[in-house]
A protein has these predicted regions:
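Helix-coil boundary and interhelical linker segments in multi-pass alpha-helical membrane proteins
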Residues: 1-6, 59-73, 122-135, 189-192
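Structural signature of hydrophobic alpha-helical transmembrane segments
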Residues: 5-19, 69-84, 135-148
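Hydrophobic core segments of alpha-helical transmembrane domains in multi-pass membrane transport
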Residues: 8, 15, 46, 51-52, ...
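Generic transmembrane alpha-helix signature in multi-pass membrane proteins
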Residues: 23-31, 90-96, 106-108, 115-128
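C-terminal ends of transmembrane helices
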Residues: 24-38, 86-100, 152-163
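Cytoplasmic-side transmembrane-helix entry/capping segments in multi-pass membrane proteins
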Residues: 37-48, 72-78, 100-111, 165-173
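Ordered, amphipathic secondary-structure segments that act as subunit-interaction surfaces
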Residues: 62-104
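C-terminal transmembrane helix-loop-helix hairpin of multi-pass membrane proteins
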Residues: 131-192
Length: 192
């Protein structure tokens, strides 16, 4: 049965959100989500890297790895592609927006090892999507990641102004907030 683009988009953004349902990309989700602006920048960078990696990894898998019978090299090849794309994003951000480059700090190079980027590239191949379906899947998954990141950052900014018991301040309240956000996203599970 052919997967519709609408189902891919809704499923990737809301139902199977890469962070809140599949638990991929937790490190940047917790690390960069203290401010909405930083979260938006990280979301944009991840979206750009995922979109480019979708095209490049699909082409490499389809036209090089499978014909040569070296599918076992998939993970290594995908990591190299993602690393090269992240370096490109880092160079562009450093020139275009030095403030965002500074705000993202160590998390920008960590996109290379962000399991969400690699995991989505591998899932795209496992689901046997066409190039266009894979691109839609990767971009919508990245948008879902960015949406969760920005919502979570907004919640964390509001929590800073509230009085929480000492035991819950910092990471504990962030994890509780993330779990409530994940439960809220579970409400979308009947959509697709």
């Amino acid at each position: 049965m052919e997967t519709t683009y609408f189902a891919i988009i809704i499923g990737s953004i809301f139902v199977n959100n890469v962070v809140l349902a599949q638990f991929l990309g937790i490190c940047p989700f917790l690390g960069v989500s203290s401010k909405v602006e930083t979260s938006m920048g990280m979301g944009a960078a991840v979206t750009f890297v995922m979109a480019l990696s979708a095209v490049v990894t699909w082409l490499l898998q389809t036209y090089i790895l499978v014909p040569l019978g070296i599918e076992y090299m998939q993970t290594i090849v995908f990591i190299l592609v993602i690393a090269a794309l992240v370096q490109m994003v880092e160079i562009v951000l450093k020139k275009v927006s030095p403030s965002l480059y500074q705000a993202l700090g160590i998390f920008l190079p960590l996109i290379t090892t962000n399991c969400a980027v690699l995991g989505v590239a591998i899932l795209m191949i496992q689901k046997e999507f066409t190039l266009l379906q894979g691109l839609v899947y990767n971009v919508s998954t990245a948008l879902g990641f960015a949406l969760a990141l920005v919502i979570f950052a907004g919640l964390r900014e509001r929590i800073e102004f509230e009085e929480a018991p000492k035991a819950f301040q910092g990471v504990p309240i962030a994890l509780i907030t993330a779990s409530i956000l994940a439960m809220a996203f579970m409400g979308f599970s009947g959509l697709v």
